[in-house]
Structure formats: C-alpha cells, structure tokens
C-alpha cells in the first residue's frame, strides 16, 4: 500500500513512467509543476525532446492559497478521478482521459492536453472558438442525462449517489456560493470602493430568500452526477475540440447548477470585456458571448430531450412532455445559480481573471459592479426569466 507524501518533480516522472501508458517510458525524463489552482499539485511530464507527454495531478491536504490552516480531505482525488471516468464513459470526446489513479497517494495520471488552451485565457484574449459552446452543451447533456433518473435504474442511481457523496467539497461550494457573499466574512475579497455594493447584498432580504432557496436545492436535489465546478478555467479548447478537466467538486446535485455555473462564467467574461478590450472593441466580443450562451443552452436542451425520447427507462418519466417540463425547472435553477456565480466571483474568495486582470482600477471596479448587479437580478428574477432569449434580453438591459 502506498503512503501519502507530497510529490516532487522527480516523483512525478517516476510515476508517469510507470502509469502513463507510454510505449517507451524511459523517454520520460523531466517534469515541471504548472498548477495555478488552489487545491492541487499539477506536473507536466516531458520526454527527451522536451515534449509534454502526460499530466500528473496530486491532491494536497489543504487549500493551497490559504495554507494548512484550511485542511481538505484527500478523498476528493478519488471523487475527481471517478467523476471524470464516469463522464468519459458518456462523453469521451469532451472529457480528459484518466490513465491511472492511486487513492492512497491521491494522485492521477491523465492525458496531456498541451495542444489545447484553457478557455478562460482564450476568452480574455478575444480568441474565438465557434464550436466550443455547442460542444460544452453536448458534454453537459450527455453526462447529466446518463447519470440521471431518466437513464439509470433506481437501484444503480441510489448506489451512485452514495458513491459520490462529497461533503467536504460541497461544504466549500455551499460557503462560497450561498453564505460568504451575504455576510461579513474574512474569506470575502473585494476592493474598498465596493463596500457599499457588498453591504447592500447583506441587507437585501429578497435576495437572501432567493439564495436560501438555491442553497436548499443544492442540498436536496440529487438529479445527476455534476462536474461541480464547470467554469471556463476547467475547460480546455482547441480548434474543433473541447475537454473538461478538474472535477474534484463532482457529486449528485441539481442539473441547473452545472448549467448555471457554465453560463455564469461566460457572463463574467461579458462583464469584463470593456476593461480587457476597451468599450468600442468589446461590443462584438460581447455579442459572441451572448451567442455562446444561446448555443450552449439550446444544444444542451435539444440533446437532453433527444436522449430522453430515445433512452428514458422509467415509464412515468418517459410520458410525453415530461422531459420538456423538467427542463423548464432546470432552466429556472440555472438562471439562479448563474447569478450566484456572478456574485461570488466578484466579492468572495475566488475571483476570475476576466475581471481581476483589468489594469485600470476604475474600470475594474465598474466591471465588478456590473457583475454584482446582474447577478442579483438573475437570482431574484429567475422564475420570470423563462427562456434563454429572455435571459439575453435581461443581460442587455443591465449592460
């Protein structure tokens, strides 16, 4: 049995030689730690020609950006690996491939995606991937349908819910999405110039009631195996290709949470574009983001309904019209969770580069205010925003 220890670059090379499935493992000779996240070590492993051939990822027993004062379970590495394996089974073209996982070392070896780029960076740089939103919608439809009650036998579904219980990581989501932004908390992070805006969130009874309802749905609705953190920084893109990574927040939850998080990150980019590109040049890019959102949702909904028509196993759920009615509830959830993502990324612990890298302070603060204002509107008006076209109209209204 392996004993947990924090990997060095040398350890990563030795491990990849053993488990990366390379024809000539001795060709793997060096590694570089490239992780920029908060929870893990990530190594690129290179061959003698300097070509990256594999990724070695190890969970740390604490939140990296905070330190050992915020401990974390290492079991999240098992949950991430098993989530990605399950998602790969249903959407191999859009999920990173896991070659090997060791639960004792909390380490996995996965395919190298050096020919891809992190989508967030490409969005900020205004590099457009016209197929990405459709591919993301297809990924979400495939993995969420095939792990839902529409497809799984009830016994299998209940067993999987138990397998993917993820209380430690869900607690982080519960705090960062639904608690911290609406109270005074040391984890919150925002410029002093936004103090009045953030205080208004804390004093907004209508908003806090709506957030409570969202949190309750996050607690109680085990609809499908979520990615749990499907933002533009956990998606790799290339010409004609999209791959989801980083699923340590995977658990069975409300389908609208993944949809809303994905849409929310496109809207965060939308909010930040005037600061990144200038007001004049941002106009066309903003329209692309809104088109991305439309394509993401319509692709997801069409694929999910087609899968439901073809593959639903439960007689009651297969009744004509039920899948469509279910998706209306998913959409309402998605709009609310989208608003939560906008707010928590603006005032909470973990921000996004789409806005944080804006050099001009006044413009950055204005973009943050835009995200906060839009986020609040989406949360409190979610039940009235009954279509993707209505969502886009609301976004334009708050621009």
UniProtKB/Swiss-Prot annotation:
Record pathway: Amino-acid biosynthesis; L-methionine biosynthesis via salvage pathway; S-methyl-5-thio-alpha-D-ribose 1-phosphate from S-methyl-5'-thioadenosine (hydrolase route): step 2/2
Entry keyword set: Amino-acid biosynthesis, ATP-binding, Kinase, Methionine biosynthesis, Nucleotide-binding, Transferase
GTP-binding in keyword set: no
Amino acids binding substrate: 229, 344
UniProt cross-references to InterPro entries, sorted A to Z: Aminoglycoside_PTrfase, Kinase-like_dom_sf, Methylthioribose_kinase
Keyword ATP-binding assigned: yes
Known EC number: 2.7.1.100
Catalytic reaction equation(s): 5-(methylsulfanyl)-D-ribose + ATP = 5-(methylsulfanyl)-alpha-D-ribose 1-phosphate + ADP + H(+)
Lineage top rank: taxon: Bacteria
Cited HAMAP family: Salvage_MtnK
Family the entry assigns: Belongs to the methylthioribose kinase family.
Subunit structure: Homodimer.
Protein name: Methylthioribose kinase
Species annotation: Klebsiella pneumoniae
